[in-house]
Amino acid sequence: MEQHFYIKWMRKEERIMRIAFLTLGCKVNSYETDKMKNKFMEAGDYIVSFEEEADIYLVNTCTVTNIADRKSRQMLHRAKKKNPQALIVATGCYVDSALAKDEQDESVDLFVPNDQKNAIVTLVKQAWQQNVADAVQSENGVSIEEKVWQISGEETGRVGGGESLMAQEEEHTRAYLTVQNGCNLYCSYCIIPYVRGPLTSKPIPQVVQELKQMAAKGIREVVLTGIHLSSYGVDDRKASSFLELKG
């Protein structure tokens, strides 16, 4: 069943943003992408498939190998080709590994390093407003555009609300939870410590809180993940153990 939502706006930056995400690389990236999606939904934006037309394409990149670098570039270029007027956002480890070179890539409009992912909504909206500061011009030059999004009833109960997307997440019974980030080993062959920074562990009370939130959404299986998971707790010199979570 199709629901038709009529959206009229005076300026492009005032309307609901349709944002498409693509995640490359590790499960930590997957977790962080989910967190970013939630932030945009809370801000009232609408998440669409990467294969759909979107206002913003956000690629959470990887740099662990040369192949990962190439894949990251390919996906960013594909997004730009899909919609040349869209805002193309690159974040993730590939951005941190080659930012100076990345900035010469005309396919990408905004680069967000890993340590700025928490501010992703603010950064993207600022770039969006700057990118489309001029009023939308229709073919006849009128600065008012009316468009119809055709969205299936299963996809949303309210455009941009995010409630139904959360409900879709609740239908899944497995989720990833990042409890550790970074690495202090600096192996000669590995770039990860340089793009993910030093070892940090999420405090156990925070882990427990997130686990409870996931359980409340119907998640039955949680996979703990990290960049160097076996080093969890070493950074606070307490060597905290996941056994503390038992019970």
Language-model features: where?
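Proteins enriched for Cys/Gly/acidic motifs involved in redox and nucleic-acid/cofactor modification
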Residues: 3-6, 10-233, 241-243
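S-adenosylmethionine
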Residues: 236
